[in-house]
Swiss-Prot record:
Example of a GO cellular component annotation carried by this entry: chromatin
Compositional bias (Low complexity): 11-22
Catalytic activity: L-lysyl-[protein] + acetyl-CoA = N(6)-acetyl-L-lysyl-[protein] + CoA + H(+); (2E)-butenoyl-CoA + L-lysyl-[protein] = N(6)-(2E)-butenoyl-L-lysyl-[protein] + CoA + H(+)
Protein known as: Histone acetyltransferase gcn5
Occurrences of domain N-acetyltransferase (ranges): 118-273
Alphabetical list of Pfam families matching this protein: Acetyltransf_1 (PF00583), Bromodomain (PF00439)
Biased composition (Basic and acidic residues): 31-41
Protein's organism: Schizosaccharomyces pombe (strain 972 / ATCC 24843) (Fission yeast)
CDD domains associated with the record: Bromo_gcn5_like (cd05509), NAT_SF (cd04301)
Residues involved in acetyl-CoA binding: C195, A196, I197, Q202, V203, R204, G205, Y206, G207, S208, Y234, A235, I236, G237
Record GO terms (molecular function): histone H3 acetyltransferase activity; histone H3K14 acetyltransferase activity; histone H3K18 acetyltransferase activity; histone H3K9 acetyltransferase activity; peptide crotonyltransferase activity; promoter-specific chromatin binding; transcription coactivator activity
Family stated for the protein in its record: Belongs to the acetyltransferase family. GCN5 subfamily.
Keyword Cytoplasm annotated: yes
Domain named Bromo: residues: 339-447
Length: 454
């Protein structure tokens, strides 16, 4: 990256900036694992924002209810008899819950920070002893955790005065992780250059807590609202969990030529949410959840707990679902029973469906849509041991027959290999197989199963 860029980075207020909870007045020093929310926290702007968001949903629900009432005066759930009809009125949607009853389960990293085990500090190369100790410790972590990155390159950027580092520090300035970034405040974004946690410290949730500290610090000290970073295949999952996406909405003219480009990396962007303090996100979500549950309980009977059924006291027995107390009231119907019997899709179904759809829609897929006809090619099934085509793959996919991603990839390879085995290399079929396989492997490398690609 050229050193002649016009953008100047904003230096931190001091050589080593303490980013612990003492700099965030809304952060509590309570070390209780399940922390109840205090009544006076309703004055917290983030709490008010959470309730306001919930109230906004309430207003929408009330509006929808009025629209519904104009055509029908009653709200009737599926499977509920006329005697169970209930009019949905706006007063049913009022927020009515004790905010002090909301409990937030805090992660180990948060508890360690509150108890003083770890601290979060923003460090720059200002030639002071403490800064150099922390930057050197962070450099050693990056060198170990990022073995493919040249050591000289890491060293140059860590000590570069245009870069800042958010570090996790234990006793005696012992660094256990951090993020090195370069702010481009005039352009409205910051580039995350390196991000790593020491291998023996990666089970305490440090990574997420570190990113939350970085977001709050950057937004609190600059006008920056966006992050850009290049992530390798192993880091994409982490960045997705932190709100990053592969969809880049920033105009290229803003960042091209300013950030470092890495071969084989995936460019990702994170746009911070206005008015959200990321270190208090768990509190905001807990309050919103409590508000939603409160509203649900006012218009449904989902919170009612019925006693056990006497019919099972004498051993196994059969009972119609309609005879189970409360089931009809929540909208049970026969169709639900049939749906529950259908096999559930595997966790990787969405990925396989995407890969199949991409293959099916590719211009080179036409020869492989249906099984090879025995009438047109009599000896095909004598030569080919494992015949395969896209219609067979689709049948297996729709019927949940793939037990693993590897099985799906194996069937796709059968299509390509069978075609090349039976046809000459100068034929259209052979060339289509090559093109489709190349496209398939490219799409596979874009998923979390990229390690299975050739």
């Amino acid at each position: 990256m050229s050193n002649s860029l016009n953008d100047q980075t904003r230096p931190p207020d001091s050589s080593v900036v303490d980013s612990t909870s003492s700099n965030f007045p809304n952060a509590s020093n309570d070390s209780v694992h399940d922390k109840p929310v205090k009544q006076d926290e309703q004055s917290n702007p983030n709490v008010r924002e959470a309730i306001a968001n919930s109230d906004g949903q309430e207003s929408l629900a009330v509006k929808e209810n009025k629209d519904t009432e104009s055509s029908s005066s009653h709200f009737v759930p599926n499977g509920v008899s006329n005697s169970k009809k209930r009019k949905l009125v706006a007063t049913d949607l009022d927020v009515d819950f004790d905010i002090s009853s909301v409990r937030v389960t805090e992660k180990p990293s948060v508890l360690e920070e509150k108890s003083g085990v770890i601290q979060f500090r923003v460090v720059s190369n200002d030639d002071t002893a403490d800064s150099m100790i922390m930057l050197t410790g962070l450099k050693n972590i990056f060198m170990k955790q990022l073995p493919k990155m040249p050591k000289e390159y890491i060293t140059r950027l860590i000590y570069d005065r245009n870069h800042l580092s958010m570090t996790i520090v234990k006793d005696n300035l012992h660094v256990v992780g951090g993020i090195t970034y370069r702010p481009f405040e005039q352009r409205g974004f910051a580039e995350i250059v390196f991000c790593a946690i020491a291998s023996n410290e990666q089970v305490r949730g440090y990574g997420s807590h570190l990113m939350n500290h970085l977001k709050d610090y950057v937004r609190g000290t600059t006008t920056i609202q966006h992050f850009l970073t290049y992530a390798d295949n192993y880091a994409i999952g982490y960045f997705k969990k932190q709100g990053f996406t592969k969809e880049i909405t920033l105009d290229k003219s803003i960042w091209v030529g300013y950030i470092k480009d890495y071969e084989g990396g995936t460019l990702m962007q994170c746009t911070m949410i206005p008015k959200i303090k990321y270190l208090e996100a768990n509190l905001i979500l807990a309050i919103q959840k409590a508000a939603v549950v409160s509203k649900i309980n006012r218009i449904t009977r989902s919170n009612v707990v019925y006693p056990g059924l006497d019919v099972f006291k004498d051993g196994p027995a059969h009972i119609e679902p309609s005879q189970v107390p409360g089931l009809m009231e929540v909208g049970w119907c026969k169709e639900m029973e049939e749906l529950s019997k259908k096999p559930r899709p595997k966790p990787f179904f969405a990925v396989l469906e995407m890969l199949f759809t991409e293959m099916q829609n590719h211009p080179s897929s036409w020869p492989f849509m249906q099984p090879v006809s025995k009438e047109d090619v009599p000896d095909y099934y004598e030569v080919i041991e494992h015949p395969m085509d896209l219609s067979t793959m689709e049948f297996r996919l729709r019927n949940n027959q793939y037990e693993s991603v590897e099985e799906f990839i194996r069937d796709a390879k059968y299509i390509f290999d069978n075609c090349r085995s039976y046809n000459d290399s100068n034929t259209t079929y052979y060339k289509n197989a090559d093109r489709l396989e190349k496209f398939f492997q490219k799409k596979l490398r874009e998923t979390e199963y990229s390690h299975l690609a050739d």
